[in-house]
């Protein structure tokens, strides 16, 4: 059984808010993406789900 992780977040830009949904195979990748986004953008409403 291979787990996948769905990351949902709200991205705030100069043009407004955008809800983003991405799917990853590894939880470490989810954490890396969140760290990178947080360093360069404003994000909130972060939700991580395990999907199969």
Q: Where are the regions that the model predicts?
A:
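A short, exposed loop/beta-hairpin motif centered on an aromatic-Gly-Thr core
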Residues: 15-28
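Low-complexity, intrinsically disordered Gly/Pro/Thr-rich segments
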Residues: 28-36
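Non-catalytic surface loops within mature trypsin-like serine protease
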Residues: 11-13, 26, 52
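Generic detector of bulky aromatic hydrophobic side chains
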Residues: 1, 32, 48-49
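Short, mixed-charge low-complexity intrinsically disordered segments
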Residues: 36-52
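Short aromatic-glycine-(Arg/Gly/Cys) micro-motifs in beta-strand/loop hairpins
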Residues: 1-18
């Amino acid at each position: 059984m291979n787990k996948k992780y769905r990351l949902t977040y709200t991205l705030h830009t100069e043009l407004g808010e955008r809800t983003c949904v991405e799917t990853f195979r590894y939880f470490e990748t989810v954490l890396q993406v969140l760290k990178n986004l947080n360093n360069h953008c404003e994000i909130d409403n972060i939700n991580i789900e395990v999907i199969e």
